[in-house]
Amino acid sequence: MNNVNLQIYSFGFDCGLSFLDKIRKAGELGYAGVELVRDYEGIPAQDVVNALKEAGIPAVSAHVGLDFIEQDLPYLAELGVKYVACPMAAFNTAEEAKELAADLNRLGKLAKEYGITIGYHNHTGEFYVDQGKYLLDWVM
């Protein structure tokens, strides 16, 4: 599984493993790295770094809600995360999509200062049409 990373979310929330144990288990299973979910709240960054070292894998990316990205950037940089994906946002119109794009652009500039790239994880709602374009096109 040399080049395959695991999204920690894949373990689910009721698997009986703590957040740190999920990281260790991913390494034990042979994954090359992990994508974090925001279950790290309240866990000191050094504890996560230690779990990653024990597992022998990096935290390549993280899924972080739009409202938490800015505050989490310093923490994620400490962990060595290079990519942050906003997993979804509520928008139903072209205007709301443009507002999301502005937010993501602002966060992208801030994230760059930490060596992190921001992305957006789309779902089906982004393919609704407003003003003749898919909502996702307005975000892009």
Tell where the protein language model's regions lie, with residue ranges.
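N-terminal pre-domain/capping segments
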Residues: M1-Y83
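Active-site acidic/histidine proton-transfer and metal-coordination neighborhood
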Residues: L17, V60-M140
